[in-house]
C-alpha cells in the first residue's frame, strides 16, 4: 500500500449461514523468515505456500536489494539464491517495507550484524511504530545508527559491523521480533549469542535456523520455567533448504470467528498451523464454548497442521490471562468481536503490546466496539467486553488506522451484527490476506465495496 493510497471502504452485512471449505494464506511469520534465511544461506532455497501479501513481498524486495536472487515459479512457489553470511551488498536505494513491521525489524537484525549499510522506511503506520527495542541490542552488538527519527522510528539508516559482538540479552518485552533480530545479528558473531525471554514467544526463528543448519539450543528459564534461554552458535554456514509454509493461524482467526457467530454456519478451514505458541485464540474460543474440531493432524515443514471444522456456537465470556498474550497477540481484535456476541463478560488482560502494533490496536478496537454499540471498557491494559448473547448492534463505521487486522475483525462483526458494519479502508487487508474477501464470499459472506 503506498503512502498516499485512496481509501477503499467496505461494508459487511448479515446474510446466509457460512458453508464450505477454505485454506487461509501461508503463515506470514514463516514467509518472512524463509526469504531472510534464504538470503543468508548458500544455494537455492525453495519455498512452497509463501504468503504473497504486500508485507512479505516487501521483505522479498529487500532481500533482493541486499544481493539475493529471487524468482517466482507460480502461486506461492518461490526460489531464493542466497549470498551467505557476510556476503550482503549495500542496497542502491531505500528499503521500503510499507506496513511490514515484522519484515523491517527482522531485516534490521540482519543488517545490524553484518558489514552493510541500509536505510529503512515504511508507510505512515510503520513510521509510528517503535524500533528502539530492536536498535538497542543491535548497538550493543556493534551496529551504528547513522540517522533516525524521534524515538528510533523509521526512516532510519543502520550500519552493521565487520563482525557482530556476541551478547546475552534479556528482552524487555515479550517479543518474537526482538528475539529474532538479535539471533539474526548473532549469525555473524564469533561466539554464542543468547536471548533470554521471560515468557515464551513464537519460535519460528529458532526452528527455521535449525532447518538451515544453525546450532540453536533452547532451555527453560526463570520462575516455574515459563521463560526461555535461546543460545545461537555464531558464524555457521547456512545451507539452502526446502520450506513448506503452513496456513497462517492469525489469518485463519477471521473465518473461524465468522463461522462461530453467523448462525447455522459449518466451515472447514484447511491446513492451519497448530504450533502451541500460536494457538492461544483457539484455546480461548474453546473455553468460551466454541465447537472447533481438529481433523487430519499432520506434519508440514516441521510444524503440526490440522484442518479445523468450525460450527456456529453459543459463546460465554471468559477471562484471558496476560501470559496467553504472546500466543495470540495478533488475534485480540477478532476475539473482541467474538466476545461481543458472547453471553457475559470477557476480560482480556495485559494488552500493552497492542498499543504499538500497526495502530494503537487497543484504542482502535475500543473505538470500533463503541461505534457498533458494544458495551465495553478499557481498564489500564485490559479490555473488557460485555455481551448479552445476542448479535452485536452494528451499524457503525470503523476507523482502521491502516491496520489490516482491525479491518478484517470488524468486517467479520458485520457478517452477524444487527446492522451492517463499514470499515473506512480495506486496502491494507492485502498486507496479510489478499484473498480475504474472495475466500469469505466463497463461504456465503456478503460484502459491498
Curated annotation (Swiss-Prot):
According to its UniProt record, the EC number is 2.5.1.19
Q: Where is it mainly found? A: cytoplasm
Location(s), subcellular: Cytoplasm
Q: Which CDD domains match?
A: EPSP_synthase (cd01556)
Q: Which GO molecular function annotation, any one, does this entry have?
A: 3-phosphoshikimate 1-carboxyvinyltransferase activity
Biological process terms from the Gene Ontology for this record are: amino acid biosynthetic process; aromatic amino acid family biosynthetic process; chorismate biosynthetic process
Q: Which domain of life is it from?
A: Bacteria
Concerning InterPro entries, the annotation shows: Enolpyruvate_Tfrase_dom, Enolpyruvate_Tfrase_sf, EPSP_synthase, EPSP_synthase_CS, RNA3'P_cycl/enolpyr_Trfase_a/b
Database matches in SUPFAM superfamilies: EPT/RTPC-like
**Disulfide bonds, paired cysteine numbers:** none
- Catalytic residues identified in the record: 330 (proton acceptor)
Protein's recorded name:
3-phosphoshikimate 1-carboxyvinyltransferase
Residue positions binding phosphoenolpyruvate: 28, 101, 129, 177, 361, 405
Similarity remark: Belongs to the EPSP synthase family.
Q: What is its pathway?
A: Metabolic intermediate biosynthesis; chorismate biosynthesis; chorismate from D-erythrose 4-phosphate and phosphoenolpyruvate: step 6/7
Describe its function: Catalyzes the transfer of the enolpyruvyl moiety of phosphoenolpyruvate (PEP) to the 5-hydroxyl of shikimate-3-phosphate (S3P) to produce enolpyruvyl shikimate-3-phosphate and inorganic phosphate.
Reactions accelerated catalytically: 3-phosphoshikimate + phosphoenolpyruvate = 5-O-(1-carboxyvinyl)-3-phosphoshikimate + phosphate
Checking Pfam families in the record gives: EPSP_synthase
Amino acid at each position: 500500500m503506498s503512502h498516499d493510497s485512496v481509501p477503499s471502504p467496505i461494508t459487511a452485512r448479515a446474510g446466509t449461514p457460512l458453508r464450505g471449505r477454505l485454506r487461509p494464506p501461508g503463515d506470514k511469520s514463516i514467509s518472512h523468515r524463509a526469504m531472510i534465511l534464504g538470503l543468508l544461506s548458500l544455494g537455492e532455497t525453495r519455498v512452497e505456500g509463501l504468503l504473497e501479501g504486500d508485507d512479505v513481498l516487501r521483505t522479498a524486495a529487500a532481500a533482493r536489494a541486499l544481493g539475493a536472487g529471487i524468482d517466482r515459479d507460480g502461486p506461492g512457489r518461490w526460489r531464493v539464491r542466497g549470498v551467505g553470511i557476510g556476503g550482503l551488498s549495500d542496497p542502491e536505494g531505500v528499503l521500503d517495507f510499507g506496513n511490514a513491521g515484522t519484515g523491517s525489524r527482522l531485516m534490521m537484525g540482519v543488517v545490524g550484524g553484518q558489514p552493510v549499510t541500509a536505510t529503512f522506511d515504511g508507510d505512515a503506520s510503520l513510521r509510528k511504530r517503535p524500533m528502539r527495542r530492536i536498535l538497542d541490542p543491535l548497538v550493543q552488538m556493534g551496529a551504528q545508527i547513522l540517522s533516525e527519527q524521534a524515538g528510533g522510528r523509521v526512516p532510519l539508516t543502520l550500519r552493521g559491523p565487520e563482525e557482530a559482538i556476541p551478547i546475552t540479552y534479556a528482552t524487555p518485552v515479550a517479543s518474537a521480533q526482538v528475539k529474532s533480530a538479535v539471533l539474526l545479528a548473532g549469525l555473524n558473531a564469533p561466539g554464542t549469542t543468547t536471548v533470554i525471554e521471560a515468557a515464551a514467544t513464537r519460535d519460528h526463528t529458532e526452528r527455521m535456523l535449525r532447518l538451515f543448519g544453525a546450532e540453536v539450543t533452547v532451555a527453560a528459564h526463570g520462575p516455574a520455567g515459563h521463560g526461555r534461554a535461546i543460545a545461537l552458535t555464531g558464524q555457521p554456514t547456512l545451507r539452502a533448504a526446502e520450506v513448506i509454509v503452513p496456513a497462517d493461524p492469525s489469518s485463519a482467526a477471521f473465518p473461524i470467528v465468522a463461522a462461530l457467530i453467523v448462525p447455522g454456519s459449518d466451515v472447514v478451514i484447511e491446513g492451519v498451523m497448530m504450533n502451541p505458541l500460536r494457538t492461544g485464540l483457539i484455546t480461548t474460543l474453546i473455553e468460551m464454548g466454541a465447537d472447533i474440531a481438529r481433523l487430519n493432524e499432520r506434519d508440514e515443514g516441521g510444524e503440526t497442521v490440522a484442518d479445523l471444522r468450525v460450527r456456529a456456537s453459543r459463546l460465554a465470556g471468559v477471562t484471558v490471562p496476560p501470559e496467553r498474550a504472546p500466543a495470540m497477540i495478533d488475534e485480540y481484535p477478532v476475539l473482541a468481536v467474538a466476545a461481543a456476541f458472547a453471553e457475559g463478560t470477557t476480560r482480556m488482560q495485559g494488552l500493552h503490546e497492542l498499543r504499538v502494533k500497526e495502530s494503537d490496536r487497543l484504542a482502535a478496537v475500543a473505538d470500533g466496539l463503541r461505534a457498533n454499540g458494544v458495551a465495553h471498557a478499557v481498564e489500564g491494559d485490559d479490555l473488557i467486553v460485555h455481551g448479552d448473547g445476542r448479535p452485536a448492534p452494528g451499524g457503525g463505521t470503523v476507523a482502521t488506522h491502516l491496520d489490516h487486522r482491525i479491518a478484517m475483525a470488524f468486517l467479520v462483526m458485520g457478517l452477524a451484527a444487527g446492522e451492517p458494519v463499514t470499515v473506512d479502508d480495506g486496502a491494507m487487508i492485502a498486507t496479510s490476506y489478499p484473498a480475504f474477501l474472495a475466500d469469505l464470499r466463497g463461504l456465503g459472506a456478503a460484502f459491498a465495496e
